[in-house]
A protein has these predicted regions:
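Generic helix N-cap/helix-start motif at coil->alpha-helix transitions
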Residues: 5-15, 40-49, 71-81, 110-118, ...
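C-terminal hydrophobic structural anchor segments
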Residues: 123-124, 130-154
């Protein structure tokens, strides 16, 4: 039906616009597009996760938990819940982290595609294992080259004390003219900021 097609198209447009505005650092505009998209389709998983990431970036972990806590059956929501709970000092952090670990282990045992970017983020932020996060980010980079993939690779390299390990990301950014405000803290004339 035409109304459904229009709603889906508007939701996808809102997702893309909000993502681009977050990349550009225009958080007010991103918030407006996320809210508009969520009004059109409150069950849109991508928008829900994008909104939670937005709230985490604004240091509002309790709000991120409120958005996600009814969706613990989704791996992406569970990852963000574990991160938000740690940031908020929420007692459920350990439980959500263990559930995410268990799911990733089950996916690896069953030879299902493990979401390496999400696993790298979890390993870096929740497990506090930069070396393993770097290995996962590197494996993810072989097939995924979105700004979020660049961010986790650069963050893991910095945290592992190996900024040069992410030189291939810097080269890719320079060659493709990637513009994303989230990457700026990791870049300074081709080197890690602060290194």
């Amino acid at each position: 039906d035409q109304a459904e097609v229009k709603r889906v198209a508007e939701s996808l447009e809102g997702q893309l616009t909000a993502t681009l505005q977050m990349d550009d650092g225009d958080l007010d505009a991103a918030r407006a597009h996320i809210q508009r998209g969520r009004a059109l389709d409150p069950e849109d998983r991508y928008l829900r996760h994008l909104y939670a990431d937005f709230l985490l970036a604004e240091s509002r972990p309790d709000a991120a938990i409120d958005v996600l806590e009814d969706y613990v059956d989704q791996d992406g929501a569970l990852l963000r819940l574990a991160i938000a709970a740690i940031d908020a000092g929420d007692r459920r952090a350990d439980r959500w982290a263990q559930q995410f670990r268990d799911r990733m282990a089950a996916a690896q045992r069953s030879a299902e595609y493990a979401h390496l970017r999400e696993l790298a983020r979890f390993t870096l932020v929740v497990e506090d294992d930069p070396a393993e996060a770097l290995a996962l980010a590197r494996a993810n980079w072989r097939t995924q080259k979105e700004p979020a993939d660049m961010h986790i690779y650069l963050a893991a390299a910095r945290a592992a004390g190996e900024p040069g390990a992410a030189d291939e990301v810097r080269t890719f950014i320079a060659e493709h003219g990637v513009q994303d405000s989230r990457l700026a803290p990791f870049l300074d004339n081709g080197t890690e900021a602060g290194s």
